[in-house]
Design a protein with these regions (language model features):
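Membrane-interfacial helix-loop segments of redox and metal-homeostasis proteins
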Residues: 1-341
């Protein structure tokens, strides 16, 4: 299981450093910059992930109903509040969990701190002292009669196979994204966006195969980077009492892939916080990301890519709220409409 996560994680780490694939960077470029190429990379990543995921399902290699995001009933309040909290925390921390791991692989000690704090706060909300409060405010339950997926919804009301819906959505998304002139002028951006999509698909394929052929039936998952960071910390501290998981392999893969990318580009260097105020701000953002991702059942990668690739109800709502929360946080940092430190 860990090797499956490691493979996709390495691809994601390379995409972050060689392809500059970054959630917050894409939002910053779109909102404040003069280019939207990195934002367009998300369209390629999502399109490839949709085509690959629904292609796996059509070929009998993936049971969509067994995936994490389609096996839980959707709680819209959790998506909205968790997404906004995560997005805001991402902006004031300066990175999401995935981005922090990628930067940590290049020697950024600030990102090491962000990753640790986010992982711990996520586990506090997931299974620690605040888990009962979280469940009381945002209860989770198993799926009822209907699978909470957009492709399933369309297939219930229109006589069309749900796989055709998902694959068509992916093809259209890629086609529309390729209308972007800046993206077409950067073949490398198209390539690395596609690599991210392939990484997501590889996660579904591997965990489905392991679930179907392993000794114990397990949940089918793909990449996400909040709870797995906490899992990795627990494994490092108590390996005798914990098994290494897909998430642990994924976290290690991103760090190793980013390290390889930095060595290739010659960007490896040690960095640290410049002053205590910066450290305090980034720690606060990391705490918010940890709590927000657990409430929303996924981070910018977990909901924005993995959940989106199965067209879960939660994905577009959570991703939109993450973007909105990030824009609010960026405005606060850049335009200073209120103090945060």
């Amino acid at each position: 299981m860990a090797f499956a996560g490691l493979f996709g994680g390495v691809l994601l780490g390379l995409a972050a450093r060689l392809g500059r694939f970054c959630t917050l960077g894409a939002i910053e470029d779109l909102y404040y910059g003069a280019t939207s190429t990195r934002f367009a990379m998300w369209g390629i990543a999502l399109g490839v992930a949709l085509i690959g995921t629904f292609g796996l399902s059509a070929g009998g290699l993936l049971d969509l109903s067994h995936t994490l995001y389609l096996s839980l009933a959707w709680n819209p309040y959790a998506s909205i509040i968790g997404g906004l909290t995560f997005g805001y925390g991402m902006a004031i921390a300066g990175n999401c969990g995935y981005g922090a791991l990628a930067r940590m692989g290049c020697g950024d000690l600030r990102s090491f701190m962000i990753s640790v704090v986010m992982g711990v706060s996520g586990y506090v909300a997931l299974g620690g002292p605040l888990s009962s409060t979280r469940l009381a405010l945002f209860p989770t339950s198993e799926v009822g009669t209907h699978t909470p997926g957009l492709a399933h919804l369309v297939a219930r009301h229109i006589p069309v196979d749900l796989h055709i819906v998902g694959i068509t959505a992916g093809v259209l998304l890629v086609a529309v994204t390729l209308l972007h002139k800046g993206l077409r002028a950067s073949p490398a951006s198209i390539f690395w966006g596609a690599v991210v999509g392939v990484a997501v698909v590889s996660g579904w394929a591997a965990t489905q195969w392991i679930s179907a052929n392993g000794f114990d039936r397990s949940i089918v998952i793909s990449h996400t980077f909040t709870a797995p960071v906490g899992e990795t910390l627990l494994y490092l501290m108590t390996s005798s009492g914990n098994t290494i998981s897909f998430g642990t392999g994924s976290v290690a893969g991103v760090i190793l892939g980013a390290l390889a990318g930095c060595l290739i580009k010659g960007h490896m260097r040690w960095e640290a916080c410049e002053d205590p105020r910066e450290l305090r701000r980034q720690m606060g953002g990391a705490v918010l990301m940890g709590f927000g991702a657990v409430v929303a059942v996924g981070c910018s990668v977990g909901q924005g890519l993995s959940a989106f690739s199965v067209l879960a109800y939660s994905a577009p709502v959570t991703l939109a709220c993450i973007v909105l929360g990030a824009v609010i946080g960026l405005r606060q940092l850049v335009e200073g409409f209120s103090r945060i430190d």
